[in-house]
Amino acid sequence: LPDPLKSQSEPFDRTNAALAGLVFLISFVVYALTVQKTFSFWDCGEFIACANILGIPHPPGTPLFVILGRVFAIIPFVEDISHRVNYISVISSAFTAMFAYLLTTKIISHFFHKEDPHPLHKFIGYVGGVAGGLFVAWSRTNWANSVEAEVYGLALALSVALVWLAIKFWENKGTLKANRWMILCFYLATLGIGVHMTVFLVVPVCAIFFILRKDATPRDYLLICAFAIVELLMIILFADGRGGHKFFYFATALLGAGLLALLYKRIQWAVVVAFVSIASVMMSFSTYEKMLFVSAIILVGMAIASKRLNLELKWKLGLTILLIGFVGISVHFFIPIRSGQNPRIDENNPSRDWRTFKNFLDRRQYGQQSMVERMFVRRGAWENQLGRHPHMGFWSYFEEQWSKPGVTFIIPFFLLGLVGMVTAIYKRLEIGMPFFTLFLLTSLGLTLYMNFADGTHYNFQTGDAYMEVRNRDYFFTPAFVFFGIAMGVGIAAIMNYIREKLSNN
């Protein structure tokens, strides 16, 4: 019998693979030439020291990074141990550039109809992909993260890979291969939390592809993306004492119920249950602990209903996702195990008891208020958080990623990315709209979530909301990376527009 998976696959594109390898190689060489030869300021020294002795750094512990760091520390390819551990970021960020190339070409490939091939279609995709990959590689903040022992290089490599895998799932939806891509995505996402929570930022957008059935229409994708955008607007609406998180939860429940009423026939409910359980880790690990149990009960109930009522609820897929997510998150059990051996660096001593371990993962030492609740208590003026302001303003970081600071220099790059996003939405809404939503979540959404302090809302009684002590540009690296990809798509869109005009003439 013919292999059903093989019949669904496209011919292997050697040129595409070679160019992906070339983008990786160019990025790797540039990073290797500019990598720090010893440790850098802030967290880098702590991570290197912990990697060398398998210690426990500040919460939430970054266990996967520490374990990988130990592997690099014992390989004597350069003399200084700090120099060795820095190469985690060098290699990871080179992979980020490579996956950015693959994601850019994947988006561009949906500009064209396969039934009407043109010799220049692939060439346009290759040019846009290389441009996108190198825009990502050489954006200022990403480059800075790529040459020191920080968690963001590895986190970004996983993030971009997850989005690429999600689109591959969408292309093969309804096949066994697609389910394998989805399970791999959930595993990498939960494993990536062991590097940094930033990895999970892309998962809600990836879930749009996962939870909708094969017969979903472009309107269904648009509705879910619109829901996510409205959520961001509601955070702004209810912030600063205008209702707070309770009103936000209530409004979200109402809108969510309405959305489900519109889409319930085209939703894979078992996947939704598993996703909600895994996504609860963004609230806290304590919440995830409860949701894991609740979701397992719901899926078992779906299994019983499926057999007795002869329904196709795909409960096995839901349980598999739930299990693989737990396996990924289980990397954090390294923390109490190693802490129990009393290494020289053992912050918070998380092996003391289960409660201490959970508080460590939930970063309780930084305050008892959850990050979600903190979003609704403004710690800075909107114009400072979104505009130009020392240590925190999003636009002040964005405008210097590919040019000198200043509106004049950033306008061409901004317009290029805008063209890319608009064209992606116009050509294939099912891909373009989630991609645009992803950029909003990693830019505006992250600005709202982090709620950086500018010093104007300082609380003299609690000491909270003092001005950020250092530049926070690294938190916005995902936004800069995805905008770099959008610029690559924009170049391809302009090239294709010129081709069409010349063909018509």
Where on the chain are the PLM-derived regions?
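Start-transfer (signal-anchor) and selected internal transmembrane alpha helices
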Residues: 1-30, 95-98, 116-130, 267-270, ...
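Transmembrane signal-anchor helices characteristic of membrane glycosylation enzymes that use polyprenol
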Residues: 12-41, 136-139, 196, 322-342, ...
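Transmembrane-helix signature of polytopic, membrane-embedded enzymes
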Residues: 18, 22, 100-138, 173-180, ...
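Transmembrane-helix motifs of polytopic, lipid-linked glycan transferases
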Residues: 21, 87-118, 161-168, 416-419, ...
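Membrane-interface alpha helices of multi-pass inner-membrane proteins
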Residues: 50-53, 132-134, 181-194, 231-233, ...
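Loop-to-helix entry region of an early transmembrane alpha helix in multi-pass inner-membrane enzymes
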Residues: 63, 75-98, 102, 118, ...
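Membrane-interface transmembrane helices that cradle and orient dolichyl/undecaprenyl
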Residues: 113-123, 162-182, 208-222, 257-271
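Hydrophobic, aromatic-rich transmembrane alpha-helices
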Residues: 253-262, 303-308, 409-430, 493-496
